[in-house]
Amino acid sequence: MNNDENYPESRKDGTVEEIFGVTVEDQYRWLEDFTSPESTAWEQNQNKFTEKYLKKGPFTRKIGKDLEKVWDGESISTPYVQNDRIFYYFNEGDWQHSKLMMKNCLEECEAEVLIDPNSFSEDGTFSLGGTSISPDGKWIAYSISDGGSDWRVWKIMDIESRELLEETINWSKFSGAVWEKNNSGFYYQKYSEPTDELLADINEQPKLMFHKLGTSQDEDELIYENPEQPRWSWSISISENNAHKILSISDGTEEKNRIYIKSNDSENFIPVIDELIGEYGYITSKDDVLFFYSTENAPNGKVTALTIKNGSYVWNDVISESNFAIRSVNIVNEKIVINYLADTISKIKFFDMNGNHLNDFNFELAGTIGGFGGGIDDKETYFNFSNYVTPTKIYKINMEDFSYDVFWEERLADHNVDDYETKLWFYESKDGTKIPLHISSLSNINIDENTPVLLYGYGGFDISILPGFSKRFLSWMNQGGVVAVASLRGGSEYGAKWHEDGMLFNKQNVFDDFAYAAKFLHATGIGSPETTAIEGRSNGGLLVGATMLQNPELFKVALPGVGVM
């Protein structure tokens, strides 16, 4: 941007605080009141200035045309099967929201629209949240979000007739709908109705409720609460034989939880894991054996089983921790499917229910594999694959012999995978830690210090940043740019320790990892500070904001999206 451009004024006030003995100036504190007339006017002036600049840019029209081209294409989600029906989300490419589709068969038949979120509101601000189908396949509970809010309104629809029941469920947040095995209703998490503005109230003291079909929410049954622990929140699962209810209790955002269990022969939930000693994620059950993913004494993850018999609870590890972090665990056709991460690349292994290794899934490409959802008795399931240059492909796999065929693949106009290349590099951060860095571009360009570079990062909340196809990144590469994605500490790429090394008092490690990614790129002859942009969203927005202040000399442009700052 030219130096003679007149930026809109940003007023500075005199706010000064002492935090942990450090004097901190916060000259823009007034912007935290984002509903004030002054903040609103500031936002409008900033947007007007930005739009004026972008319209003058010589590349805006070219980039816009390329974005239109790459965005013009269908997309679907990985299907899941229930009650001999196939469900998936579908978008023709120009819909604001994907539609939930349903096939009334397991082979070849026409798909029909089950729920169209584009019909929820004229301006498209209402979106479809979670969905849950009753065990008998008659009902679907689905939630609606207004303007991206975490608050959800649940509705219930008859799948055959498409008729909605009269009742709605309000003030639900961070919750699914878990059906009773007899199809009588479902469990959900409810908060008290806010008394203040929705964005100002603190959400505490949730209740686990049961909603019975055909009744109003006022009649819902309270299943569990703990007023002495206002930060706790709940999710519930039910064993396959309907004998045990598994209550997972979280405390804030920590990736550890408690497990309480209520069996049919007990009146109350009994604490089985009552300390925050690790993450315990319920997978499924066989008879009275419950299977969990756990990080207790296993930072990379393991599979463990809880046998419930005559009021006793006995734990046994089924698959021990390995050198690779576990990304996901599924049990399909009585086979345990583990998705390991080997330097951010998916490695799939199959085991029997006793933990004996059956087979390695030797997929022909390197990248990210997801899916393998389904029930313990399902004979088939679906998985997906992509990387930074390969559009998404979805496969149907036979879980008897592990053979698979393409179910659907993303097709883009004039896109040839062979025209691009992606490589995994490693660099050393400030403290010597080795960090993965995926670098992608057109294969025929000459990369030097003049090459535009987009450096992306996240680094937090136990979320892995893995190879995946992005139309935004593709458009950047089509303009001759390099996309560099760093898998920073704070995520789960290398297990729980990798996460802990980038959180709380270790957060500076994440900022250092990101800065040293830029230094590595420039030292390798990939771009320069004058040609580098950094980008991140949410926690990644915080990352970019911190990097703007700590290392402004390493880049020209910063894009902090919806940062948690």
Residue ranges and their predicted role:
Residues 198, 231-236, 245-250, 293, ...:
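Hydrophobic alpha-helical scaffolding
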Residues 138, 452, 556:
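Conserved acidic residues
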Residues 118-134, 144-149, 163-167, 397-538, ...:
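Cap/lid segment of the alpha/beta-hydrolase catalytic domain
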